[in-house]
Amino acid sequence: MARELSQEALLDFLCQAGGRVTNAALLSHFKSFLRDPDASPSQHQHRRELFKGFVNSVAAVRQDPDGTKYVVLKRRYRDLLGEEGLQRPREPPAAAPSAGGAAPCSPRGARRGEPPQQQPRRRRREKEPEEEPAGAAARAADAACNGLPGSDSRRAPGKGGGSKGSPGQRPPVPAAAAAGAQARASCAAAKTQGRCCWECLQNNLAVLPGELGALPHSATAEEKPARALPAQDDRGASREREEGALAEPAPVPAVAHSPPATVEAATSRASPPALLPGPAPRGDRPELLTPSSLHYSTLQQQQQRTREWVARHPQVPEARDQGPIRAWSVLPDNFLQLPLEPGSTEPNSEPPDPCLSSHSLFPVVPDESWESWAGNPSLTVFRSIRCQLSLQDLDDFVDQESDGSEESSSGPKDSPGASEEGLQVVLGTPDRGKLRNPAGGLSVSRKEGSPSRSPQGLRNRGDGHISQQVPAGANGLAGHPLKPLPWPVPKLRRSLRRSSLAGRAKLSSSDEEYLDEGLLKRSRRPPRSRKPSKAGTAPSPRVDAGLSLKLAEVKAVVAERGWRHSLWVPSGEGSAALAPHRTSEHKSSLVPLDAREHEWIVKLASGSWIQVWTLFWEDPQLALHKDFLTGYTALHWIAKHGDLRALQDLVSGAKKAGIVLDVNVRSSCGYTPLHLAAIHGHQGVIKLLVQRLASRVNVRDSSGKKPWQYLTSNTSGEIWQLLGAPRGKPIFPVYPLVGSSSPTRKAKSKEISRSVTRKTSFAALLKSQHNKWKLANQYEKFHSPREREEYSD
C-alpha cells in the first residue's frame, strides 16, 4: 500500500514492478488515497485528477489481447529500471502468503490475478540480456539467471512465508551444497571479459572458480547482513563483498577497479564482534570464510532484503522524516562502491564493521560510542534512489507540490526546525554515534545516545560518490591529508534559489550526473547555472574558511544559516567550528521589520503625522530608518506629501534629540527629498530644503536628472532659479524670469522691423496682373446665370 500520493511514489512502484503493472494492481496500491472513506468528494476528485496527471506524465496504458490493462513506463524512462532490473512486480507483504508455494525458479511475473498466458511473456522479458546493476536482489529466486543450479536456488524472502515481521526463517543449507554451488558457478562473462556478471557479483560469485579461497573476512561478511539497505537493494552489500574480497592478495579480476585505499582499510583495521561463533578478536588478521559461513551470510542478506521490503511497503502509510532527494543518476562501471545506509539497521543487530562503514573509504579508528548506536531505534527507510530521480520534465509537479520548500513533493514536510537548518557537508565520520540519516543523507552528531536529526543536505549515493572519513587525530579537515581517490573527484554543483530556507550543496561524481536543483536553496541568493562546477569546490559566498576539493585531499564545504553549526572531528576530540556563519551584516536589510518599524513606515506613507511624532519621540532613531522597498526616509515621505509644517517639526525634533538628518539622502531610485518635492510640485518644501537646510541642487538621481528637470509649467521662475536651472527660457515658461524689457528697447525693436522691407520683382507684378485678368474673364463665356449653373453642375 502506498504511503503517499506523489510522483515519486508512482515512479517507485512502477520501477519495482519492472516498468509494467496491471491497472488493477496500480489502483489497489494507491487505494488508500483514491478511495479514502474519510475524504470528501472534492478531495476524492482532486486526488483522482492528481493521480491521472502523475500516471500520464511517466507511463501509458496498454491493453493485452486478453483484455487486461497494463500501465507501462514510458520508453524515455526505461533507464530507471537499471536499479530494479526487468523483474516483474513483487507482491506487498499482505499478498506474500499467496505466493508462498511458488517454485524457487518461478518467474516474478506470476502474481495473483494474472492470466497464465502472461507468465511465459514475463519469463522471456526476465531473461533479456540487460544488466541489472541493483536489481539482482529482486531476482535472487530466479536460479537460471544467476548462474546457480536449481538445487541451490533460494526462495525469495518476500515471496515465501517470510513476510511482515519474521522474514527468511529457513533451515540452513549444508556446507557441502554451498561449496558445490560455488564450484559449479562459472559465469560466461568471467571467461570472456575476465570478470563475473552483476548477478554473480551480487550472489557472492565474484571470484573465479580457481580462486574460491579469496573470500571476504568472516567477521566482515557475517555482520554485513545485519545492515538494512534502504532503497538501494543489493548494491551496498555487493560493494562490501568486493571490499572484503580485496583483503586477500590473490588477484580478483571482478573487483580490480576497487580503490587501493579500501585494501589498506580492509587489511589493517580491526574487526568488531561477529554474528557467528568464533569471531576474530579486535586486532587479529582477517580469516577466510568457509563455504558454509558464506552461504549463511547469503541467507542473512536475503533476510535483510525481506526487512527492506517490509520497511518500504508498510501496510499503513507512515510519516517520513523527509521527502526523498531527487537526482539524475547514470551508473558507471564501478558503481558497486556505494555507501550503505546504516540508519535502518535492526536494533538487535551488531554494529557494522568500522572498516566497512557506510561512508568509509579511508582508515578510521573505531570509536567506543558505536556500541551505543546499536540500541537506537531504526530510522525510517527511504525508497530506491532511481525512483527518486529528478526528471527535468517532472520538476513542475514537484515544485507545485512542495509549496516553496526544497523537499520532494512525495514526502510529508519536515518539522520546522529541520527545514530551517543549514547544510553540513561532512566527509565521513569514525564516530559511529554520528549517523547518516537515510532521509537527509548526512551524518550528524549523536547526542545522548540517539541520532540527531540530519539537515537536508548531501546524500552520498552510488556512481562513485565518495564520502570519506576524517582520520583520527585531525583537528580539522584541512589539517590531515587524505589518500588520493582512484577515480575522478566528485564535483560540487549547486542550484541556488532565492528563499528563506538554508542553503545546501551536493556532490556529483561524473559529468553526466548532477544532483537536483530543486533540493538546495541558498538564503536570498540569485540563481545560478545547473552546470557542474569545473573548478572543483565553489564555496558559498558566506563561507569565510578557504575550503577546496582536490585530488589528494577532500575538505568540507559549509553553507550556513543565521546560527552556527559545528562540524565534528573523529575520536571524540571535540567539535571544531569549521563554519564561520553569517554575522549581523544582513540584519539591517534582510531581516523582517519589527512592529514599531512597520508602523513607522505605514504612518509616514499615509501622512498620519500625530502617530508619526508619537513613534518618533519613543525612538528618535526611526527618523533615519529607510523603507525597505523604496528606500525612503522620513524626509522623503514628508517631501512627497508636501507638508511644510511636518518638515519643520521633524527638523526641530531631530535637533532636540541630537540626531543629524541627511537632507541629501538618496532613495532606491536615487531620489533626494528635493527630487520628490520637485516631482510633486511642492514649492514651499523646495524653498525650505534649499534655503534653510542647504539641500544640494546638483545631485542627480538614477536617471541622471537634477531636481530642476522635474519642474512643471506651473512652477514660478523663482523656483527655477533656486534649483539652478540654466539661464534663458525655461522648458515651460509662463512669464519671463527677468523683469520686462525697457520701453526704449521695445521701440528700437519695432523700428528695426519696420526698416526691413522687401522690394517686389517684375515677375510678381506680372503674376498679380494675370490673376486679376483671370478673375475678370472667368465667367464671360456664360451669357446667363442659367448657363452658368448648368455648367457648374
Curated annotation (Swiss-Prot):
The keyword Repeat applies. Residues 521-533 have a biased composition (Basic residues). InterPro entries: Ankyrin_rpt, Ankyrin_rpt-contain_sf. ANK repeats lie at residues 630-659, 669-699. The keyword Phosphoprotein applies. Residues 396-406 have a biased composition (Acidic residues). Residues 96-108, 134-144, 175-185, 246-273, 407-417, 498-508 have a biased composition (Low complexity). Residues 220-244 have a biased composition (Basic and acidic residues). Residues 83-185, 219-290, 337-360, 396-543 are annotated as: Disordered. The modification Phosphoserine is found at residues 106, 271, 761. Keywords: ANK repeat, Phosphoprotein, Repeat. Belongs to the SOWAH family. This is Ankyrin repeat domain-containing protein SOWAHB.
